[in-house]
């Protein structure tokens, strides 16, 4: 079994998946196709057409509310079920019974999240909303940074709660005072983190929330 904890994970930025866009992506050690229909709905399916195995993300196009296979133009709906076979008067019963695996998706915080569970369970919780991201007073021209790091996701989580290294690695003035609380899958932390700068020590605070393994937000004051 793939050693990835279940939860919501960011798979794209909302503004980078326009109406009609089709992307070949790979998450959770699987190939997927991510697309936005003509009505604006986002869907992420397993990548391969059940008909003859063509990759829907390479040459596939959006047709209305479906993604059209590049091989025989079979059209698959956002729920993974067959929508249309253009050259067939009737859809064969076997095709009607076929369903491409669909990842639950949600758009929030100007991001596209997909739900992963190793056994295909439906989402156990909701994605959080972080008001600063869509608040006009904070602006809408956010910088985006992406890093590819070769480590297990558990290493990232453990680093976040390792307050002892802050003073030696990040320049915190002293060992930070911190508090951690839990609520179901959510983890909240608050800590004082005075920073040493060329102009002297600056008092600071860091607070954050982890809503499962792939939905995290940190505030610096």
What are the functions of these language-model segments?
Residues 1-7:
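Hydrophobic, proline/glycine-rich low-complexity stretches
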Residues 12-133:
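Rieske [2Fe-2S] iron-sulfur-binding domain
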Residues 8, 102, 144-146:
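Well-ordered beta-strand positions in beta-sheet-rich domains
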Residues 41, 120-221:
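C-terminal catalytic domain of Rieske-type non-heme iron oxygenases
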